């Protein structure tokens, strides 16, 4: 059995920016983001001395199990010691996957397909909207980091169908 037999598609995660991240060095931090989906792990570049970093980086994961959560961890890069953890968040992909399974062609650009509100059960800092934009389903997410005194990270999800994949 090949990867293509189980492959549903590609999840592209745009790591946009961090907001008011924790200070882990003398007066600032050198943050980067690690994203994990199943056994896959990808990271952004380090932004030096900035608690409001702009990453604007696309990280792409192959998706074989739509039930796996996406985990985000922010670290402070250190040269001479272990990198300090600056908080984490977990993203439930199920609402996004459900939207992908709907028949949505012909909708006006910008249409809100679904709204997910912040709750104790998720890491959302504010309402997250799943929208139809340029014939694609896009979800903008602002995450409140856990296990840290402060900080938020903004990401955007986008799905890429692959020819020959199982699809959703």
Swiss-Prot record:
<keyword id="KW-0938">Abscisic acid signaling pathway</keyword>
<dbReference type="Pfam" id="PF00168">
    <property type="entry name" value="C2"/>
</dbReference>
<keyword id="KW-0479">Metal-binding</keyword>
<dbReference type="GO" id="GO:0005096">
    <property type="term" value="F:GTPase activator activity"/>
</dbReference>
<keyword id="KW-0343">GTPase activation</keyword>
<dbReference type="GO" id="GO:0005634">
    <property type="term" value="C:nucleus"/>
</dbReference>
<feature type="binding site">
    <location>
        <position position="76"/>
    </location>
    <ligand>
        <name>Ca(2+) 2</name>
    </ligand>
</feature>
<comment type="function">
    <text>Stimulates the GTPase/ATPase activities of Obg-like ATPases. Mediates the transient calcium-dependent interaction of PYR/PYL/RCAR abscisic acid (ABA) receptors with the plasma membrane and thus regulates ABA sensitivity.</text>
</comment>
<comment type="similarity">
    <text>Belongs to the plant CAR protein family.</text>
</comment>
<dbReference type="InterPro" id="IPR000008">
    <property type="entry name" value="C2_dom"/>
</dbReference>
<feature type="binding site">
    <location>
        <position position="78"/>
    </location>
    <ligand>
        <name>Ca(2+) 1</name>
    </ligand>
</feature>
<feature type="binding site">
    <location>
        <position position="76"/>
    </location>
    <ligand>
        <name>Ca(2+) 1</name>
    </ligand>
</feature>
<feature type="binding site">
    <location>
        <position position="24"/>
    </location>
    <ligand>
        <name>Ca(2+) 1</name>
    </ligand>
</feature>
<feature type="binding site">
    <location>
        <position position="25"/>
    </location>
    <ligand>
        <name>Ca(2+) 1</name>
    </ligand>
</feature>
<protein>
    <recommendedName>
        <fullName>Protein C2-DOMAIN ABA-RELATED 3</fullName>
    </recommendedName>
</protein>
<dbReference type="GO" id="GO:0046872">
    <property type="term" value="F:metal ion binding"/>
</dbReference>
<keyword id="KW-1003">Cell membrane</keyword>
<dbReference type="GO" id="GO:0005886">
    <property type="term" value="C:plasma membrane"/>
</dbReference>
<feature type="binding site">
    <location>
        <position position="84"/>
    </location>
    <ligand>
        <name>Ca(2+) 1</name>
    </ligand>
</feature>
<dbReference type="GO" id="GO:0009789">
    <property type="term" value="P:positive regulation of abscisic acid-activated signaling pathway"/>
</dbReference>
<dbReference type="GO" id="GO:0005543">
    <property type="term" value="F:phospholipid binding"/>
</dbReference>
<feature type="binding site">
    <location>
        <position position="77"/>
    </location>
    <ligand>
        <name>Ca(2+) 2</name>
    </ligand>
</feature>
<dbReference type="GO" id="GO:0009738">
    <property type="term" value="P:abscisic acid-activated signaling pathway"/>
</dbReference>
<feature type="binding site">
    <location>
        <position position="25"/>
    </location>
    <ligand>
        <name>Ca(2+) 2</name>
    </ligand>
</feature>
<comment type="subunit">
    <text>Binds to PYR/PYL/RCAR abscisic acid intracellular receptors in an ABA-independent manner, both at the plasma membrane and in the nucleus.</text>
</comment>
<keyword id="KW-0106">Calcium</keyword>
<dbReference type="InterPro" id="IPR044562">
    <property type="entry name" value="CAR1-11"/>
</dbReference>
<dbReference type="GO" id="GO:0043547">
    <property type="term" value="P:positive regulation of GTPase activity"/>
</dbReference>
<feature type="domain" description="C2">
    <location>
        <begin position="1"/>
        <end position="106"/>
    </location>
</feature>
<keyword id="KW-0446">Lipid-binding</keyword>
<feature type="binding site">
    <location>
        <position position="30"/>
    </location>
    <ligand>
        <name>Ca(2+) 2</name>
    </ligand>
</feature>
<dbReference type="InterPro" id="IPR035892">
    <property type="entry name" value="C2_domain_sf"/>
</dbReference>
<keyword id="KW-0472">Membrane</keyword>
<keyword id="KW-0539">Nucleus</keyword>
<feature type="binding site">
    <location>
        <position position="78"/>
    </location>
    <ligand>
        <name>Ca(2+) 2</name>
    </ligand>
</feature>
């Amino acid at each position: 059995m090949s990867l293509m037999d189980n492959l549903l598609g590609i999840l592209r995660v745009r790591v946009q920016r961090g907001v008011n991240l924790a200070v882990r060095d003398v007066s600032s931090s050198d943050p980067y983001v690690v994203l994990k989906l199943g056994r896959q792990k990808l990271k952004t570049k380090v932004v030096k001395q900035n608690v409001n970093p702009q990453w604007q980086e696309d990280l792409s994961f192959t998706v074989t199990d739509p039930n796996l959560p996406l985990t985000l961890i922010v670290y402070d890069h250190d040269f001479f010691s272990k990198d300090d953890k600056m908080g984490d968040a977990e993203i439930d992909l199920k609402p996004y996957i459900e939207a992908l399974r709907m028949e949505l062609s012909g909708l006006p650009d910008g249409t809100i397909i679904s709204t997910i509100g912040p709750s104790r059960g998720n890491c959302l800092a504010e309402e997250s909207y799943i929208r139809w934009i340029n014939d694609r389903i896009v979800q903008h997410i602002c995450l409140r980091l856990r296990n840290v005194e402060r900080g938020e990270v903004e990401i955007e999800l986008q799905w890429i169908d692959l020819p020959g994949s199982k699809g959703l």
